[in-house]
A protein has these predicted regions:
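Surface-exposed acidic, glycine-flexible loop patches that form ligand/cofactor-binding
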Residues: 1-8, 39-44, 120-135, 211-216, ...
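Patatin-like phospholipase
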Residues: 8-16, 22-119, 154, 159, ...
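Extended hydrophobic secondary-structure segments that form protein cores and membrane-embedded regions
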Residues: 14-17, 46-54, 135-140, 191, ...
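Hydrophobic, mid-to-C-terminal alpha-helical segments
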Residues: 186-188, 206-235
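C-terminal helical/tail subdomains of lipid-metabolizing enzymes
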Residues: 2, 7-10, 106, 181, ...
């Protein structure tokens, strides 16, 4: 008789976090709510791979560096208003909001300086190679018209990104067009928000797990966190004037649903098992804007509420014990060509 415990595949847990500006308060609060019951362990230590785009990329990097979700929630609460130019009083905020709307017609709406300062204070001089968990952070190179994905050294081919500053990766993935200026790397590469092509990084993470890491799709468990989903309708004869901001939502929704469909097919979700747990909340159109910091407390409460509701289902799947230690192929004090490929964690 076959011993199933010997032939069972080791299960791998993946965390994916969407982009969405200040709406990232929702998934951060959700994770902070779950973290309260992990006996002091940071929530990121329970995952084998973490992927995040834009604001989700900032959260992903912080978690992979060992920060607690509650620490990152403090970042949103305390620095969010400064990053998005609010907190100066109702009258001043109202005037500045109108000025920024005008500015957005010809250039980026917000100054990226406060965001950089907040990230430098949070991440310091840590590099991607300091991550305790495998990372996947998408950005976009508009000049080369190509994807640009920051990755930890979890495969012998990944010889460069682990030396990049974590702050650079965070600024690149969060450089949302019309909101923040392009982030220029030390090698003069201009990068913009990964949300332009992978705002929901779930499919990206699943493909990485199966191809680069060699993990079978049926061994994967994915916790996918959204930054709210809007309801809206589009008329058959809609033009630019009637669509407005719905155009962006249209493309983002299409990408997200496509990503979820691909991930479900690759993991055998629904037909063979429940592989993907998607956490999101549907709200009316324009009820929550990605740079409106007045909704931070509402988002925080919503995140904690969802955590309380979903914890009984998620705990046995994701939080029974921390993930195995990640051993990168290359380390920061060792040159790639001298490093042993035997350190590969696949």
């Amino acid at each position: 008789m076959t011993d199933e415990t010997e032939t069972a595949l080791p299960e791998r847990r993946i965390l994916c976090i969407d982009g969405g500006g200040i709406l990232g308060t929702f998934p951060t609060a959700f994770l902070a709510g779950l973290e309260q019951h992990l006996q002091g362990q940071p929530v990121g230590s329970y995952f084998d791979l973490i992927a995040g785009t834009s604001t989700g990329g900032i959260i992903a990097i912080g978690l992979a560096m060992g920060l607690r979700a509650s620490d990152l929630l403090d970042l949103y609460e305390k620095r969010g208003p400064e990053i998005f130019g609010r907190g100066r009083g109702r009258v001043t905020d109202f005037i500045m909001d109108r000025l920024r709307l005008g500015r957005q017609l010809v250039m980026n709406k917000h100054d990226s300086g406060p965001l950089r300062t907040a990230l430098e204070e949070t991440l310091g001089d840590k590099r991607i190679g300091d991550a305790a968990t495998r990372l996947l952070i998408p950005a976009w190179n508009p000049v080369a018209r190509s994807v640009y994905i920051y990755k930890t050294a979890h495969h012998p081919r990944l010889r460069n990104d682990y030396r990049s500053l974590a702050v650079d990766a965070a600024l690149a993935t969060a450089a949302a067009p019309t909101y923040f200026r392009q982030h220029v790397t030390q090698h003069a590469v201009g990068l913009t928000d990964g949300g332009t092509w992978a705002n929901n990084p779930t499919a990206l993470a699943v493909v990485e797990a199966i191809t680069m890491l060699g993990w079978p799709g049926e061994s994967l468990h994915v916790l996918s966190l959204g930054c709210l989903e809007e309801t809206y309708t589009i008329r058959k004869w809609a033009g630019i004037g009637t669509l407005g901001s719905k155009v962006i939502k249209l493309f983002m929704d299409g990408q997200s649903h496509s990503a979820m469909g691909i991930a479900k097919l690759l993991t055998g979700h629904e037909h063979e098992r429940t592989a993907i747990h998607r956490i999101n909340h549907t709200v009316p159109h324009s009820a929550y804007k990605m740079d409106d910091t007045r909704v931070i407390q509402d988002l925080k409460g919503l995140g904690y509420s969802f955590a309380r509701d979903r914890q009984p289902v998620l705990d046995p799947v994701f939080f029974s014990q921390p993930a195995e230690a990640f051993v990168p192929v290359y380390v920061l004090d060792q040159e790639p060509e001298k490093a042993s490929t035997e350190r590969c964690s696949v």
